[in-house]
Design a protein with these regions (language model features):
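Short beta-strand elements in bilobed, periplasmic/extracellular small-molecule ligand-binding domains
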Residues: 13-20, 36-56, 159
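Solvent-exposed, acidic/flexible segments
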Residues: 24-28, 52, 56, 77-80, ...
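Hinge/cleft segment of the Venus flytrap/periplasmic-binding protein
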Residues: 19-23, 27, 37-38, 130-178
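Hydrophobic alpha-helical
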Residues: 35, 48, 52-117
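Local beta-strand N-terminus motif with an aromatic residue
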Residues: 13, 46, 72-73, 124
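Short, solvent-exposed amphipathic alpha-helices that sit
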Residues: 1, 26-45, 62, 86-90
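Hydrophobic alpha-helical segments within soluble ligand-binding/sensing domains
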Residues: 1-14, 59, 111-115, 130-147
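Rossmann-fold dehydrogenase core element
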Residues: 121-128
């Protein structure tokens, strides 16, 4: 998972701006729970945790407010790619380096093709993918149940992928970018 990847970076200090999606949505709940649990377990500091409702401009404003406050931070954990893009816009405007060998680690989610290209170029560090076939697979199960068919598999594990700037390839961008 994304937070495990972040832990493996061994940053020494973790001062995180956590930009959340629409509160109560499945993606927000899951991504926030993962971050909060890891931050508590590892003693990470969440400098700011605020909802941007999947909006790039709001994410940019949240990030700018932290920059203006003078608080130290070295991780942007944005719960979707658009919000990560907004956060990066604030960093760029303030001439704060980010990505591979930068001062701030950038993490997004959803594996939009343009976002994976940012990872490939080293401007972002990580982009996570929740399996895009989950919805269609769940719909298929519901239809089977509605038709009276029995579902034999009680547990289904869907693979999730994460793309790291140090290992991503152009083939990954072409295959997994949406």
């Amino acid at each position: 998972t994304a937070v495990n990847w972040l832990k493996e970076q061994n940053l020494g200090e973790y001062n995180i701006i956590h930009i959340q999606g629409v509160m109560g949505s499945a993606a927000q709940v899951g991504r926030t729970a993962a971050m909060n649990e890891m931050a508590e377990a590892e003693g990470w500091t969440i400098v700011k945790q605020q909802a941007a409702d999947w909006n790039a401009e709001t994410a940019q404003q949240i990030t700018q407010s932290v920059i203006d406050s003078g608080q130290d931070f070295n991780v942007i954990y944005a719960e979707n790619d658009d919000m990560a893009r907004g956060a990066v816009a604030a960093l760029d405007a303030a001439n704060i380096s980010h990505g591979v060998d930068g001062d701030v680690v950038i993490m997004g989610f959803d594996t939009n093709k343009w976002a994976l290209e940012e990872v490939l170029a080293g401007r972002w560090n990580y982009d996570g993918q929740c399996n895009p076939y989950q919805a269609s697979y769940i719909d298929e199960i519901i239809q089977k149940l509605e038709n009276g068919e029995e579902i034999t598999e009680k547990t289904i594990v869907m693979e999730e992928k994460g793309f790291d700037a140090k290992t991503i390839t152009q083939e990954d961008v072409d295959t997994y970018g949406i």
